[in-house]
Design a protein with these regions (language model features):
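Conserved, structured core segments of small domains
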Residues: 1-94
Length: 94
């Protein structure tokens, strides 16, 4: 099933501005971690570091068996995933 997970964080806490944060992101999106989590990462999009606003937003498109699998995938990430919603390609539902 296809899902979109949404994440936000304050710009002042952006992991992209800290070496430890960059390491965390590299580990999270490593092929090994993705494989072990049992997901397919279709796409990952963040407004940072280009967004100079107060809040950065991220959207992750993930193929997984259920919402819990996605939450487990993000477990090591020290940020909160706000929402995980199932999605489908609109043209295929018509």
């Amino acid at each position: 099933m296809l899902f979109v997970a949404e994440h936000t964080h304050p710009a002042s806490e952006c992991p992209m501005t800290m070496p430890s944060g960059k390491d965390m992101i590299k580990e999270l999106f490593s092929e090994e971690h993705i494989s072990n989590a049992g997901i397919e990462l279709v796409g990952a999009y963040m407004s940072c570091p280009n967004d100079e606003g107060a809040i950065h937003k991220g959207y992750f498109i993930i193929e997984a068996v259920d919402e819990e699998t996605i939450k487990n995938f993000f477990g090591p990430m020290k940020v909160e995933i706000r929402e995980v919603k199932p999605f489908s390609e609109i043209a295929k539902t018509l």
